[in-house]
A protein has these predicted regions:
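Short alpha-helical "patches" and their helix-cap loops
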Residues: 47-62, 152-162, 284-287
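Right-hand nucleic-acid polymerase module
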Residues: 26, 31, 35, 119-122, ...
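Short helix-interrupting loop/turn segments at helix-coil junctions
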Residues: 43-47, 109-110, 190
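Conserved two-metal-ion catalytic palm core of "right-hand" nucleic acid polymerases
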Residues: 1-101, 313-318
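Short acidic (Asp/Glu) and glycine-rich catalytic loops that position anionic groups and cofactors
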Residues: 15-16, 46-49, 81, 161, ...
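Short helix-capping/linker segments at secondary-structure and domain boundaries
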Residues: 41-48, 147-149, 274-277
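Conserved polymerase palm-domain catalytic core
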Residues: 67-162, 166-183, 196, 200-201, ...
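Beta-rich nucleic-acid/ligand-interaction surfaces
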Residues: 55-64, 166-169, 199-208
Length: 318
C-alpha cells in the first residue's frame, strides 16, 4: 500500500567548528523507513563503492583514511605532489532527479524506488542533512567519478572523504588535468568545485638540509613525511571539553555522561597521532582520564539498571 506521506520539515540551524549547517530532523516513522531502505541499499552501494572513499560508510571513518595516506607516504611512491579540492555546498546542491537516474541503473524494483521518492518528496534540489538516507545517496552519486579518477586518469593515489578530494602523483600536470576533469564531471551533475583547489609539492628536505614544500591537511589530520598531527580546531575542541570537566570537578558538580563520553571519544585522535606531548601539557594536568573512564562505566551501569527495571515493570503490567 502506497499510503505513507512524509511531513514538511522546518530546518534547524546548527553552528559547529565555525560552519553554519541547515539540518532537518526526520520523524520516527521516516527514520524507521529510511533504515529499512538503507538495509537494502547498503550491499548495493557499499559493495560497489571505491575502496578509498571514506565517511558515512560503516568501518570507513577518518582513521581508516589516515592509515591509507600514511601507507602512501611510507611507500615513498607517487607522493611528490598533492592536489586537493572540495565540492561547494555539496548536500544542498544535489538534485534528486540526477541521483534517481543513477539508481534506476542498479535498482529495478519500482516500489522500492517509489519509497525513496516519497522520502525525498520535499527535497527535489538538495539532500537534507540529518536524513540517514542522504549520506548513502550522496556517496552513491560520486561512485562513478571516483573510479574514473583512478582508472581513466591513472592517478597514483586518490582518497575522497565525502566531498573532499585528495590526490597524489609525481606528475603535477596529471594532477591539474585530474582537477579539470573533476570540475567538468561535477558540472554535469549540477555541482561546483570550490575555487580554493590547490596543487602543491609535498614537504621534503633538500640536500642542503633546508625544508621546503607543505604538509597535507585532510580529514582533520596534518600529514608530514615522518609524523601525523591533528588540526588546530580539533585540539582546541578537546582542550575546551577538558576545561569544562576540570571546572565541574573544582565546583564539586556531577560530570554529565555525554560530556565524558565525548571527551574519551576525542582522545582517540591523540592516540592515533604524534600529539602526546601536547596532551601532557594541555590535558593531563586538567583531567584524570582513568577517573573519567570509571565514571562512564559507573553511570552506564546505572542507566542500564534503570532501563532494565522499567522494562520489567512494563512486562509485569502487561
Amino acid at each position: 500500500q502506497k499510503r505513507f506521506k512524509p511531513v514538511k520539515h522546518n530546518p534547524v540551524i546548527i553552528k559547529e567548528f565555525g560552519k553554519t549547517r541547515v539540518v532537518y530532523v526526520p520523524t520516527m516513522v521516516e527514520l524507521w523507513i529510511q533504515h529499512v531502505i538503507v538495509m537494502i541499499l547498503e550491499p548495493i552501494i557499499a559493495g560497489s563503492s571505491y575502496p578509498m572513499s571514506f565517511s558515512s560508510f560503516p568501518g570507513r571513518g577518518s582513521l581508516k583514511g589516515q592509515r591509507a595516506i600514511r601507507r602512501w607516504i611510507e611507500s615513498g611512491k607517487g607522493i611528490r605532489n598533492f592536489a586537493q579540492a572540495d565540492i561547494r555546498h555539496f548536500y544542498s546542491h544535489i538534485q534528486y532527479k540526477i541521483v534517481r537516474k543513477k539508481l534506476e541503473r542498479r535498482v529495478k524494483d519500482s516500489f522500492f524506488l517509489h519509497l525513496i521518492d516519497v522520502c525525498m518528496t520535499y527535497f527535489p534540489k538538495e539532500m537534507p542533512l540529518g536524513f540517514y538516507l542522504s549520506q548513502w545517496l550522496a556517496n552513491f552519486m560520486l561512485q562513478e567519478l571516483d573510479y574514473d579518477i583512478k582508472c581513466k586518469l591513472k592517478i597514483a593515489h586518490h582518497v575522497r572523504y565525502m566531498d573532499n578530494y585528495t590526490l597524489a602523483d609525481d606528475n603535477k600536470k596529471k594532477l591539474h588535468q585530474a582537477l579539470l576533469y573533476i570540475r567538468q564531471a561535477l558540472g554535469k551533475m549540477r555541482l561546483r568545485m570550490k575555487n580554493d583547489w590547490q596543487v602543491f609539492r609535498f614537504e621534503y628536505t633538500k640536500k642542503n638540509g633546508k625544508k621546503t614544500g607543505r604538509c597535507v591537511s585532510a580529514m582533520g589530520w596534518l600529514f608530514y613525511r615522518s609524523k601525523v598531527l591533528i588540526r588546530k580546531h580539533i585540539l582546541l575542541h578537546v582542550e575546551r571539553i577538558a576545561r569544562k570537566l576540570h571546572k565541574k570537578e573544582e565546583n564539586g558538580q556531577r560530570f554529565p555522561l555525554g560530556l565524558c563520553r565525548g571527551f574519551v571519544s576525542l582522545l582517540g585522535w591523540i592516540t592515533h597521532s604524534e600529539t602526546y606531548d601536547w596532551y601532557l601539557i594541555h590535558i593531563k594536568e586538567l583531567v584524570n582520564v582513568r577517573k573519567i573512564k570509571r565514571i562512564i562505566s559507573k553511570m552506564t551501569r546505572e542507566v542500564n539498571r534503570h532501563a532494565g527495571m522499567e522494562k520489567g515493570t512494563l512486562q509485569r503490567a502487561a
